[in-house]
């Protein structure tokens, strides 16, 4: 049955492709917004991830990648993690459908950086504007929660970030930086697209700045029939942010986000020779209030945040969970002495959860009375510049405290060396950690309330060389060793696991001629773990952006994966995806666009039993007022 549906799906895709070919003189974003810096990378790129203050990427000893809104939009994806997967070296996101990740059994959206992330993802920390994001009960982010419409850029820290960001930043950090209006005025955008598998995605955004006041509101609706029957998915999302500059030194801001996700999954049961349909109905919300300050020699912020979730799942018996999380983030950056900057910070968070029903029962295995964990952690960092910024030393220390797991010390040290204007050598050592989740501590037969945190030590070296606008290269080698990894033995969770991951990462960008931007990346990873899912041994990206005419733009990329482990009974996956995008700027107010994905019609899967889509096509418009 599944095979027949796959052939019918390919026929429908071919028809859709033919339908949209005349429309392919189309768009993702107005070329008026393009500049030479769009793809040329970025020797002076400024980031906040890894330091809590705006810092040149090459002044940090850690590996931080940046993906801007233009690059996200060229993928044609509205779900952020789908747009990011494969774009950053050593970062991989599991997927299972044309749209929608899902949760629980059969769900995808697992994130791994350099093979670290866990299953589900509780070893990579998702953040929005520096605010940690994960469901309190299961300690992992909900992948469908994040969309691209409100994103200015994304900063990805490859390697541990626990000194600054605490638990769950064991393998890396994905920090989503939201848009801010830079000039007075009102800007409204409506974007809508339709394509394969009756997929429709639309979003409305409004950005305002007037004097000291600014705001951003985005609303979106996405839906699809899915690549097989009864594999439908839909979500409604809202993001709102306001800010007010109290004075030249102080700023007040607040935000709120809400998403409702509904989906069906017929495949998981089929893999177990059953016939039920998994139904999911997930509602999650987050809000925060932040007060920031900025003086000549010091700046910082105080943020209060709260998140909550209400999950209903039938697989096939009814499951219901509730969770929430409250936290405080405080830090202050100070120019300690000449050419030295320090940060003193403190984090507090308490997360709670309960499962009133599991397996259709209000008692027994799988249900959970109200549980909570509280964490509080001070930390310090110091960065010293020597010899007119030729050598920069960096270090930090966090004292991680928890009412459940005691106290743990987390150090990081590194340096950045600039012998010439165009050469940079960086090296660092950092420790990361992850506290066990409620699921591992209290749920289901393997649970063990006596678990300790997992930890990792990471060592890396990066060489960067900028030849000119024609060529910029980054090469990174790393070695990571994990300890106290939670694994199930003899029917019980224990801290008996360990691993060693090592690898190589290469990034190249170039602008050989005007109006042509090239980029390429490659990553290799070897792990001592032989059954590590969502962590390909080899991964590469080759991409180009070409503007042959003033209003016409072409984006092309080839993504390749090799040695991807799925399951013992499945051959390791090796595939290449050719994706093509077109943009036509009709007027200053409207763009047309189309995206053709998997033109190689690769036959592959990432989650066991879930075939990925073949050739797909989406096309639509973007109205700017």
Report the location of each language-model feature:
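Extracytoplasmic beta-strand/coil segments of soluble accessory domains associated
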Residues: 82-131
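Membrane-embedded beta-barrel scaffold of Gram-negative outer-membrane proteins
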Residues: 213, 299-313, 350-353, 418, ...
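Flexible loop and strand-edge segments within Gram-negative outer membrane beta-barrel domains
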Residues: 224-231, 235, 245, 249-325, ...
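Surface-exposed extracellular loop regions of Gram-negative outer-membrane beta-barrel proteins
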Residues: 269-270, 359, 403-409, 415-417, ...
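Gram-negative outer-membrane beta-barrel transporters
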Residues: 386-387, 477-481, 495-564
